[in-house]
């Protein structure tokens, strides 16, 4: 058993990407750009699926409130995979708040597949050979014992910027009901692990649902609220009372109601930022010279966002 453990640890070090670029072998460089941020500089970690990286803007949050955040989200990211990403982030940063986008709670997969994802996510963060076991086909001999050197800088801090406008012209989808859509057992298992991890590390946890006409409903809202209430977690659902932050489905989505564009992300993030400023003791870093790169990144962000 000891020999096997040594082999796993050694293989994990040798096969793990030594840079957080696509060329370095990392999966999804945008989601892993936090490796390149100065140590302990990220206060808020945002995880979830494509709704999160489309609808949350770290640089809008920075400009308005001086909070530092990173969106480590991926398409179809499960809660188990969110847990894995958070374990990695916590090795680099002293996170004060975790924002978990809840759309991924309802990503369904076969029991065997979901169990495998949970095991891979929980073990992969500690033993990367489970995540990068196929990398031996591409890794170069001089990379095997090389120390990690993360160089990829994601200006948008994990956000997917989009100037596309394709509005949703349909009817109201948030029709109030007492019904609930069941959260899969595998998701609840992963959620319990994530909630426990936050409690053990004294990290605040916020459940967030960004506007999504095609994937959200009142039945899902009720199910998440039940779990959140049971665990004593705040749940912020931006699909309800959208008018309070000026959201407009005709102008604020890039694909007809599934994901937000950059205009929608700005509106949603400023609303979230106001809520955070009133409910969490987060630090405003705008006057700190150690964070001057954020000002440069914000200027570059403004050049890319046209809506």
What are these regions (language model features)?
Residues 240-258:
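Accessory, usually C-terminal, subdomains that scaffold auxiliary metal cofactors
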Residues 253-290:
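Histidine-centered active-site loop/cap adjacent to the catalytic His
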Residues 46, 71-75, 178-184, 209-214, ...:
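Second-shell loop/turn segments in exported
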Residues 97-108, 158-245:
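Conserved, well-ordered alpha-helix/loop/beta-strand core segments that scaffold catalytic motifs
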Residues 113-204, 285-307:
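Secreted/periplasmic serine-hydrolase-like ester/acetyl group-modifying domain
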Residues 47, 51-130:
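Membrane-embedded segments
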Residues 2-68, 78-88:
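Membrane/wall-proximal cationic-aromatic binding patches
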Residues 56, 60, 81-84, 122-131, ...:
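Extracytoplasmic/secreted proteins, especially bacterial periplasmic and envelope-associated proteins
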């Amino acid at each position: 058993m000891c020999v096997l453990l040594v082999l796993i640890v050694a293989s994990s070090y040798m096969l793990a990407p030594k840079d957080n670029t696509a060329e370095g072998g990392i999966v999804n460089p945008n989601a892993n750009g936090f490796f390149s941020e100065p140590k302990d500089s990220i206060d808020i970690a945002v995880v979830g699926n494509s709704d999160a990286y489309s609808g949350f803007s770290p640089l809008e949050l920075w400009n308005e409130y001086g909070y530092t955040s990173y969106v480590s989200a991926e398409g179809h990211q499960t809660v188990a995979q969110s847990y894995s990403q958070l374990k990695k982030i916590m090795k680099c940063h002293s996170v004060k708040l975790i924002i978990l986008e809840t759309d991924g709670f309802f990503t369904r997969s076969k029991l065997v597949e979901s169990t495998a994802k949970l095991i891979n996510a929980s073990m992969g963060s500690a033993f990367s050979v489970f995540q990068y076991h196929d990398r031996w086909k591409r890794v170069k001999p001089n990379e095997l014992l090389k120390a990690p050197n993360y160089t990829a800088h994601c200006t948008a801090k994990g956000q997917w910027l989009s100037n596309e406008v394709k509005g949703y012209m349909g009817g109201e989808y948030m029709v109030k009901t007492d019904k609930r859509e069941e959260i899969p057992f595998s998701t609840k298992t992963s959620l319990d692990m994530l909630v426990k991890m936050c409690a053990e590390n004294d990290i605040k946890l916020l459940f967030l649902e960004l506007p999504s006409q095609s994937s959200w409903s009142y039945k899902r809202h009720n199910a998440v609220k039940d779990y959140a209430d049971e665990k004593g977690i705040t749940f912020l659902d931006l699909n309800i009372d959208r008018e309070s932050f000026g959201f407009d489905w005709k102008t604020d989505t890039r694909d007809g109601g599934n994901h937000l564009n950059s205009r929608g992300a700005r509106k949603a993030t400023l609303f979230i930022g106001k809520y955070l400023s009133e409910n969490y003791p987060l630090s405003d870093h705008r006057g700190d010279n150690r964070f001057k790169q954020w000002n440069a990144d914000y200027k570059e962000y403004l050049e890319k966002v046209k809506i």
